């Protein structure tokens, strides 16, 4: 039964979510079509209601839901058994895992009726389609070559952006997309696409190995790219079955227990801090001991095999809960909010239109003129909010770039203690023998790059926290401005119709009276257009992190490293040569190396601080500018729509006789149709919630 709960239940629950997604997407599309047809009919009757913004928003949401997938990013160092794990997860020997080859390109695994691989290039070449065998042959390399490339700072396939593998697998068909990233070393980790996926996936599956618990490379990656960034990570400790094999006496139960407990302590000590959600420790729902090879062998013999004892049932149960309950519900809730909003806007517009049908042209003009002061107030609210965004932008850009500047200038102060953990094993004789000098220089350069990368990552985390706080403040302001804005729009309605607007006091935040631009600005709605490998994620709120990411990966750290390393190695070499053969003690040489490195570093820090702090300033500024552009556009759209809704009616009245009865009937049926679509969406959403109990 446990196994049924794992694989089959996961597939069933995914299927259920896919059906609800598809149903809601269809309802949103119908809602959009209904409103659109009514708008077209308005041209020959009392004029359009100007609902363009709602039409655009719900059709984007519908498209996003139609394409909706759960994206899982698989991360892990070389030789952690990632491919074996993935093959076990999907139940087929799909990815190359024999004799340790490494997939050397970022691979996106998604559903396709035909098996095929498409390679996407980054140099303008057209994508290339391959069959499976050719892909395995052409784009995998053995670990020795991978290590060599890493040391030389080279990529195996520098012209390849990513590969898309399409495959007719049930798990993929039900809406799972798997992104397999090549490795954790810095060149790959800093790759914009990999980092982009880290920030744009539903969950990260971080594969480790029981026999190599929490290596320095893994700890550095987690510290630099995962820590404190609000990401959902599942840690999969692979090859747990090998713990037993590594014992002197594999049958000694006590020794096995002691060995496993020691390992668990190491993992717990290193991973617990990544398993807190809203202050709650959920380690047991995030860390799993797996035997992927056992699970794979069983599933290849029988896709329905019992996987008890491999760790897979527990892991899949937890992943299932996370994706089909937490994540799916959040995504569908947004769609429901948009639908409610579109229906409310339609009903409000009808409510304003009906009383005005009875007025003649002069009376209508008089009423339109009477609300001019209110429109001025709306513009004023927009300007106030815009001003606040700009003030926040300037303060943050200045503050964050200053913090970068002083951070860089202060690196020298703690360099000697900080650099210790990175320093290569130092054998001075190696350095003096020409044959090994090259290798020594390479090791030193790598150590220095790691040091800079880690320092930069630590700084970006504090910068992100500051920016996040600033956006939270703006979100609160958006709520306030939104409330004032709604009061004014209510006054407009009252003046136009001569009827009081009733306010429902018992609404939740999602359905409060906030205008839709304010909901967007508060981060309740996210309508991303899709950037990475053509798919957007329905995350919540405005995605400023991707903007920062683009700036920081492009400049960032690569720029700093190049600026400093080249000039850096020469003087260190001279300093070491100057010690002469009399000073062969490693300790003395080590001190000398750090001293010279510091001296050289300090020379270049002011230049780096000066050049790069401008980039940091621009990056932060662009985050707030992008936010302001969208907010202002949405407010302007709303003001324009409110005006044109009135102008449309006036124009129709001036040019034709409006059939009042016909309009009453048309609006009544429009209102019934949109409410019916909304009820379908509400029902689909509630049924899913009820099913999860």
Locate predicted features.
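C-terminal modules of long, charged coiled-coil scaffolds in eukaryotic assembly complexes
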Residues: 511-539, 543-544, 548-553, 645-693
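Globular "head" domains of long coiled-coil molecular machines
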Residues: 36, 59, 63-329, 566-578, ...
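N-terminal low-complexity/disordered regulatory or targeting extensions
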Residues: 1-79, 92-164, 228, 455-497, ...
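C-terminal helical "lid" subdomain and adjoining coupling/linker elements of P-loop NTPases
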Residues: 298-307, 322-363, 377, 381-388, ...
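A non-catalytic, extended alpha-helical scaffold characteristic of dynamin-superfamily P-loop GTPases
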Residues: 369-624
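Alpha-helical heptad-repeat coiled-coil segments that mediate oligomerization/polymerization in large
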Residues: 350-371, 375-378, 382-385, 389, ...
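Core structural elements
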Residues: 50, 284-295, 341-348
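Intracellular, membrane-proximal regulatory regions of polytopic membrane proteins
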Residues: 253-254, 288, 297-301, 397-398, ...
